[in-house]
């Protein structure tokens, strides 16, 4: 029993038999400890159990915990490959007691495992205890039979563990093995303790106190146990090798790399092979746990790890991407213990291949430039910081790779000069920001961004997380605190809240901490990756540096996800129905509805909208998974992904795919593939239902589509159904007969309106004049004259009426004045052809308009029309025309 997988199983099985719950490893991205970049110990997932904030169904647990130490204060990255024991990824085996057994039982369990199960020799072992922990020393004597010289008392913090400035804490006891005189080093506490002869492999933490203040420490009512054993170190001990890289798991990974390169490791290349093997593990597990390479936060640390491995692959002669080819070997070694590695194998492979393909150009160019910049330098010299910064800023060559490349030549880098060059660039960027026309209040976010860095977004995987408040902004200025009722903007180191972008509205919810809560009404993105939570302090006083819990409004986020995913389906359906010229010109994804604007130069017919809706719902009922991948822009577009108008994309993009096409060229292919950074449903069925409710024009060649999903769509259909049933009840018919009945009524109305128009025409021509107006045709100034005020005749029907009047007169002048519901008048004057030489209809209609309180009018000499605000002056208008005829 000495293989890594066998050692892990033996450890977990041993503690299972001893009444411990075997708990799966938590993800590498901690959800309940915002102070950590990555999970780096087994106790991280039990933090709230130890502090009493969380209850579990068990009081004893054991785990094999995935851990990463790279970035932040826990950073082994630069040492990996050059020492026998440093790793960025390692497995921490541990057993835990939550107020169950304590010091004596913990020591007994550990001793029995390492001597009886693992078979370690007592005379090779020794332990350390905290210098005042006589109790632990006594138990080691009792259980292991150690003499005082095998129990070393340590007075430093190495043997006293604390969760923080306050909280649970207690002494430690570490177990060491003596690897023999052939290895340099001394026992713990000696001047030579940093050597490798005495190797610590298990740390037992006895949580028996609570640090109340800096000065006050009290006993815990229920002391607990937290232990951690490095699996890789234990494997090196049991397999009798000097380095963790010589254990079976690492040998297999190094063999896979050697086979792919066609080159066996030797003294000159062994460090590079070790770097590749270790970094393959950390990169793969981080990607499998949802971290993707980026230029900020965890993603940046992942990118550094990947690129450091890729640099060493290049040193070994790799002329094409190597890392992705090694993923199957890693899955064979560790996939059974960690199923998430199996599930994420494709994503891990694609991510590694993409990153290495993109980075090779940077690497080759950067190494060439570095060679030129250092051709006059020798061992012991220093590369100036300005040149190192230029390599980083202009050519994308990271500082740590510059240092790593020069390390082999014993050349250092002027880090102070590098930092100074970076600060100068920031000052220039800030000056440019201030002069860019942004509102003065917006510049505060640039300052905050400089101090805090970008916000880590967790919202693709979770709607709840913990964080630390890094900045508070009130009235456009940073403040240290804000009280109840204050409107405040909050910046946290990591957040599940989505910041408004890509048309999707920002999240709302609650941010709370000890003694305070903030109601978040919006989340926005500011200043290059800074997420700003806008809200009002609902209770207490909030201060910068406070630990907080962030909870997104789940119901609202659910509706936003459904609406955003529906825009993708509708967009693709529109392209299929209307043509590939359709492109999105803008969008709004709100919780209540969605709308987006598309390029299309004519109204969309009802039949076309019905087909769009049908096709979108066809994908909804598939309930197919919605997948996301990280790709280069060029690769994404080459695969058919749609890039949206007006959006800015970085070198890497998130590609969202959903549905399977059923018809034509899309058959059996992904239905919708778009570049998108928004939040989406897990499966298309989560959308529920898509209902297109309107199509309108917003600009030349641009149509606006509005739609509803899920419950909103169902309510819309319910309301339409209620209205249909109400109409049917009014008509005293069944709902199915309503369309035919309405069509018949419309035809009947059309006929009645036509009959009414004819009746009004006859009435106007045959009599019924208003009081004071002539009832028969007259002669004025020697010509025939017909003038009447008519009601119920629309302005557009006055001209046909005037034509009929001319025909009735044969020769003469006709005037008709109509009125609308607002008592505004319309007037038409017509002159028969034989009289247009004497009278102009345009001149006469202007006279009539003036009498009605209007002015102007226009038309032809034989027919003109005008209006006026006062229809009660209709008879005055007719009289004015008669007077004009007499005066002519």
From Swiss-Prot:
Keywords: Aminoacyl-tRNA synthetase, ATP-binding, Cytoplasm, Ligase, Metal-binding, Nucleotide-binding, Protein biosynthesis, RNA-binding, tRNA-binding, Zinc. CDD domains: AlaRS_core (cd00673). Its cofactor is Zn(2+). GO terms for biological process: alanyl-tRNA aminoacylation; negative regulation of DNA-templated transcription. Binds 1 zinc ion per subunit. Its EC number is 6.1.1.7. SMART domains: tRNA_SAD. GO terms for cellular component: cytosol. One of its GO terms (molecular function) is aminoacyl-tRNA deacylase activity. Pfam families: DHHA1, tRNA-synt_2c, tRNA_SAD. The keyword Ligase applies. Disulfide bonds: none annotated. It catalyses: tRNA(Ala) + L-alanine + ATP = L-alanyl-tRNA(Ala) + AMP + diphosphate. It comes from the Bacteria. SUPFAM superfamilies: Class II aaRS and biotin synthetases, Putative anticodon-binding domain of alanyl-tRNA synthetase (AlaRS), ThrRS/AlaRS common domain, Translation proteins. Zn(2+) binds at residues 564, 568, 676, 680. It is found in: Cytoplasm. Consists of three domains; the N-terminal catalytic domain, the editing domain and the C-terminal C-Ala domain. The editing domain removes incorrectly charged amino acids, while the C-Ala domain, along with tRNA(Ala), serves as a bridge to cooperatively bring together the editing and aminoacylation centers thus stimulating deacylation of misacylated tRNAs. Belongs to the class-II aminoacyl-tRNA synthetase family. Catalyzes the attachment of alanine to tRNA(Ala) in a two-step reaction: alanine is first activated by ATP to form Ala-AMP and then transferred to the acceptor end of tRNA(Ala). Also edits incorrectly charged Ser-tRNA(Ala) and Gly-tRNA(Ala) via its editing domain. This is Alanine--tRNA ligase.
């Amino acid at each position: 029993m000495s293989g890594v997988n066998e050692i892990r199983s033996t450890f977990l099985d041993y503690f299972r038999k001893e009444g411990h719950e075997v708990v799966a490893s938590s993800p590498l991205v901690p959800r309940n400890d915002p102070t950590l970049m990555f999970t780096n110990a087994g106790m991280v997932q039990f933090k709230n159990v130890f502090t009493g904030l969380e209850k579990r169904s068990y009081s004893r647990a054991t785990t094999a915990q995935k851990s990463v130490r790279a970035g932040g204060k826990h950073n082994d990255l630069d040492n990996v490959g050059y020492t026998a024991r440093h790793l960025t990824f390692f497995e921490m085996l541990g057993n835990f007691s939550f107020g169950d057994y304590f010091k004596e039982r913990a020591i007994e369990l550990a001793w029995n495992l390492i001597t009886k199960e693992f078979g370690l020799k007592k005379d090779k072992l020794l332990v350390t205890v905290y210098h005042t922990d006589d109790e632990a020393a006594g138990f080691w004597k009792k259980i292991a039979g150690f003499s005082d010289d095998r129990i070393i008392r340590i007075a430093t913090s190495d043997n006293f563990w604390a969760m923080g400035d306050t909280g649970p804490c207690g002494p430690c006891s570490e177990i060491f093995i003596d690897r023999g005189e052939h290895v340099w080093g001394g026992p713990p506490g000696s001047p030579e303790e940093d050597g490798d002869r005495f190797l610590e492999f298990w740390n037992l933490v006895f949580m028996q106190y609570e640090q109340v203040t800096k000065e006050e420490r009290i006993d815990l009512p229920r002391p607990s146990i937290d232990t951690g054993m490095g699996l890789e170190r234990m494997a090196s001990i049991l397999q009798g090798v000097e380095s963790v890289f010589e254990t079976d798991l690492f040998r297999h990974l190094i063999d896979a790399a050697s086979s792919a390169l066609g080159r066996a490791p030797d003294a000159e290349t062994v460090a590079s092979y070790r770097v590749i093997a270790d970094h393959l593990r950390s990169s793969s597990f981080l990607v499998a746990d949802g971290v993707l390479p980026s230029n900020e936060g965890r993603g940046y640390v992942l990118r550094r790890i990947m690129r450091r491995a890729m640099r060493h692959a290049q040193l070994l002669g790799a002329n094409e991407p190597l890392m992705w080819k090694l993923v199957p070997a890693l899955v064979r070694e560790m996939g059974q213990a960690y199923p998430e590695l199996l599930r994420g194998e494709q994503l891990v492979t694609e991510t590694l291949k993409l990153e290495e393909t993109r980075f090779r150009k940077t690497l080759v160019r950067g190494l060439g430039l570095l060679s030129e910049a250092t051709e006059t330098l020798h061992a012991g010299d220093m590369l100036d910081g300005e040149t190192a910064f230029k390599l980083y800023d202009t050519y994308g060559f990271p500082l740590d790779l510059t240092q790593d490349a020069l390390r082999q030549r014993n050349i250092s880098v002027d880090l102070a000069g590098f930092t100074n060059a970076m600060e100068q660039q920031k000052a220039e960027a800030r000056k440019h920001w201030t002069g860019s026309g942004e509102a003065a209040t917006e510049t505060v976010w640039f300052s905050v961004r400089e101090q805090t860095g970008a916000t880590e977004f967790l919202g693709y995987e979770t709607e709840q997380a913990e964080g630390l408040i890094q900045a508070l902004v009130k009235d456009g200025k940073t403040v240290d605190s804000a009280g109840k009722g204050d409107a405040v903007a909050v910046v946290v180191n990591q957040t599940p809240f989505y910041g408004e972008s890509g048309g999707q509205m920002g999240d709302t919810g609650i941010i709370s901490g000890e003694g305070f809560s903030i109601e978040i009404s919006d989340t926005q993105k500011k200043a290059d990756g800074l997420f700003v939570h806008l809200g009002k302090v609902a209770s207490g006083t909030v201060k910068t540096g406070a630990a907080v819990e962030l909870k997104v409004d789940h119901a609202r986020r659910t509706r936003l996800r459904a609406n955003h995913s529906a825009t993708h389906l509708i967009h693709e359906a529109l392209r299929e129905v209307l043509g590939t010229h359709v492109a999105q010109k803008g969008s709004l994804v709100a919780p209540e509805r969605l709308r987006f604007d598309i390029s299309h130069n004519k109204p969309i017919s009802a039949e076309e909208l019905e087909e769009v809706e049908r096709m979108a719902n066809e994908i909804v009922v598939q309930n197919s998974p919605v997948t996301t991948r990280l790709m280069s822009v060029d690769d994404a577009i080459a695969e058919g992904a749609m890039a949206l108008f007006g959006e800015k994309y970085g070198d890497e993009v998130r590609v969202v795919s959903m549905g399977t096409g059923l018809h034509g060229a899309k058959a059996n292919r992904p239905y919708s593939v778009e570049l998108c950074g928004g939040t989406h449903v897990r499966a298309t069925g989560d959308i529920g239902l898509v209902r297109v409710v309107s199509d309108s024009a917003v600009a030349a060649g641009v149509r606006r589509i509005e739609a509803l999903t899920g419950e909103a769509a169902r309510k819309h259909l319910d309301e339409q159904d209620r209205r249909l049933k109400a109409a049917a009840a009014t008509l005293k018919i069944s709902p199915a007969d309503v369309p035919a009945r309405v069509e018949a009524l419309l035809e009947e109305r059309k006929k009645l309106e036509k009959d009414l128009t004819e009746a009004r025409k006859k009435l106007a021509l045959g009599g019924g004049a208003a009081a004071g107006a002539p009832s028969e045709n007259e002669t004025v100034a020697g010509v025939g004259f017909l003038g009447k005020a008519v009601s119920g005749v629309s302005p557009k029907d006055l001209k046909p009426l005037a034509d009929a009047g001319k025909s009735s007169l044969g020769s003469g002048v006709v005037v008709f004045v109509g009125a609308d519901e607002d008592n505004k008048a319309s007037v038409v004057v017509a002159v028969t052809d034989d009289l247009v030489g004497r009278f102009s209809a345009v001149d006469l209609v202007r006279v009539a308009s003036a009498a009605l309180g209007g002015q102007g009018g226009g038309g032809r000499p034989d027919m003109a029309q005008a209006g006026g605000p006062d229809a009660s002056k209709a008879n005055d208008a007719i009289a004015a025309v008669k007077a004009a005829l007499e005066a002519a």
